[in-house]
Amino acid sequence: MRLRGRGPRAAPSSSSGAGDARRLAPPGRNPFVHELRLSALQKAQVAFMTLTLFPIRLLFAAFMMLLAWPFALLASLGPPDKEPEQPLALWRKVVDFLLKAIMRTMWFAGGFHRVAVKGRQALPTEAAILTLAPHSSYFDAIPVTMTMSSIVMKAESRDIPIWGTLIRYIRPVFVSRSDQDSRRKTVEEIKRRAQSNGKWPQIMIFPEGTCTNRTCLITFKPGAFIPGVPVQPVVLRYPNKLDTITWTWQGPGALKILWLTLCQFQNQVEIEFLPVYCPSEEEKRNPALYASNVRRVMAKALGVSVTDYTFEDCQLALAEGQLRLPADTCLLEFARLVRGLGLKPENLEKDLDKYSESARMKRGEKIRLPEFAAYLEVPVSDALEDMFSLFDESGGGEIDLREYVVALSVVCRPSQTLATIQLAFKMYGSPEDGSIDEANLSCILKTALGVSELTVTDLFQAIDQEDKGRITFDDFCGFAEMYPDYAEDYLYPDQTHFDSCAQTPPAPTPNGFCIDFSPENSDFGRKNSCKKAD
């Protein structure tokens, strides 16, 4: 598979929003991966700080949290859904000031000596919702503690000792994963607060729904834009020489990020409040368009590209299995294009056998774009051409359908490595015994990993113990059971990043204040018909 599609393509945009903006090409880096490499001098600094300033900073931060707890407890007494009193009582203003001061002192002790603020924060009557991006770390809580704005959080967070009390003080909107109707209720609550004419605190929302490495802005969830009220975009920057801030699904874990950040002499953060964005009537009717146009405004301010990757792509990148996707995989782009054609991977999985049989019958015969469109039963479109180009490695205008089915199998069931390999053996295997040669194995694994270059000679020879020049699925399966780390040992023996980028997250969501609350049955996405091949 090719690592890039055909490049930038014009995308229509509402005249009321971003104007003649263009959808940029997929980013060169996987937005869900962060690789942190320290020089010898930086390692020496971390070692020195670990023995000196780090424990002091950590203990002081914990002390400040404990100091803030009684004030937050006092101010959070009473029913959480009761409208705040207007104007605020003097004692509440004092508590609010004290909590902001305590939190700012905590961040200062952690090395955030100066927080640069650009622009003006809008009044609640001007913009009830603040949309923050890019979301890259739990340190993004800094603007929350500086403004004491409400946020959207998972309901489990309120039961955490001390932290839960501090959370309740800012009157967040809670989302319960156990309540199937919770997302709809959350959107309704946000809408109610947003239309209260400033009676409620502003709500800060991270519309990306997950953490990225700040190289681009991924798709914004429409939840923050469904109320159809003006929003104020807020962009975050961390202009540090060494990026110890970024906390993505693949990369350093939460504790390591905390340790390395507190071991820096100084950490920088910039918060820029952009002008309030007032939606047009068209955007009020179409929250997805509203979200897209706000994203373009924020991307322009940041100087980064936009991409249609989503939280689901993040899950694909981190799926467990013997073949973990490398950082330069193009399967994320493939998954985006699948959705762009209106094909939902969760609905396609049951038809994979039918797809593979259709591809097997062609015996490797190449097809052109019109035939590919007929195979998928979709019209020829820009998205289809981009997908076609991913498999047209030679640029000759022809592709092998078997590669498409292998890639689709990975996207539909990313954790089931052997199921994908077995499906591939059925398509590539000889009619006599289902065996494949080294060239077939190379094609299968390159497609399954979404890379254009891969050497499989060592792996093939290790499996082919009898030196027959061909292997069966049983041979492969037996070898995989004996050597479950065969990918690292035989495919990437010299690439240390393959291990370091493959960390499994502890929970389905990256943190408590960045969850997706958009209704699952939302009609605000693409409405292409979902057709399947026979």
UniProtKB/Swiss-Prot annotation:
Composition bias, Low complexity: 8-19
Domain of life per record: Eukaryota
Motif (Di-lysine motif): 531-534
Residue ranges, Lumenal side: 79-534
Gene3D superfamilies given in the database record: EF-hand
Sequence ranges on the Cytoplasmic membrane side: 1-57
Effect of residue 208 to A: Loss of activity
One Gene Ontology cellular component: endoplasmic reticulum membrane
Annotated compartments: Endoplasmic reticulum membrane; Golgi apparatus membrane; Cell membrane; Lipid droplet
Pfam families named among the record's database cross-references: Acyltransferase, EF-hand_8
Keyword Calcium found: yes
Assigned keywords, A-Z: Acyltransferase, Calcium, Cell membrane, Endoplasmic reticulum, Golgi apparatus, Lipid biosynthesis, Lipid droplet, Lipid metabolism, Membrane, Metal-binding, Phospholipid biosynthesis, Phospholipid metabolism, Repeat, Signal-anchor, Transferase, Transmembrane, Transmembrane helix
Annotated consequence of substituting residue 169 to A: Slightly reduced activity
Activity regulation (UniProt): Not activated by inflammatory stimulation. Inhibited by Cu(2+), Fe(2+), Ca(2+) and Mg(2+). Activity is not affected by Co(2+) or Mn(2+).
Motif HXXXXD motif boundaries: 135-140
Outcome recorded upon mutating residue 233 to A: Reduced activity
GO BP: any one term: phosphatidylcholine biosynthetic process
EC number: 2.3.1.23, 2.3.1.51, 2.3.1.25, 2.3.1.67
Summary of the tissues where the protein is detected: Predominantly expressed in lung where it is enriched in alveolar type II cells. Expressed at lower levels in spleen and brain. Also detected in erythroleukemic cells and reticulocytes. Weakly or not expressed in other tissues.
Alphabetized SUPFAM superfamilies for the sequence: EF-hand, Glycerol-3-phosphate (1)-acyltransferase
Notes on the domains: The di-lysine motif may confer endoplasmic reticulum localization. The HXXXXD motif is essential for acyltransferase activity and may constitute the binding site for the phosphate moiety of the glycerol-3-phosphocholine.
Role of this protein: Exhibits both acyltransferase and acetyltransferase activities. Activity is calcium-independent. Catalyzes the conversion of lysophosphatidylcholine (1-acyl-sn-glycero-3-phosphocholine or LPC) into phosphatidylcholine (1,2-diacyl-sn-glycero-3-phosphocholine or PC). Catalyzes the conversion 1-acyl-sn-glycerol-3-phosphate (lysophosphatidic acid or LPA) into 1,2-diacyl-sn-glycerol-3-phosphate (phosphatidic acid or PA) by incorporating an acyl moiety at the sn-2 position of the glycerol backbone.
Protein name: Lysophosphatidylcholine acyltransferase 1
Gene: Lpcat1
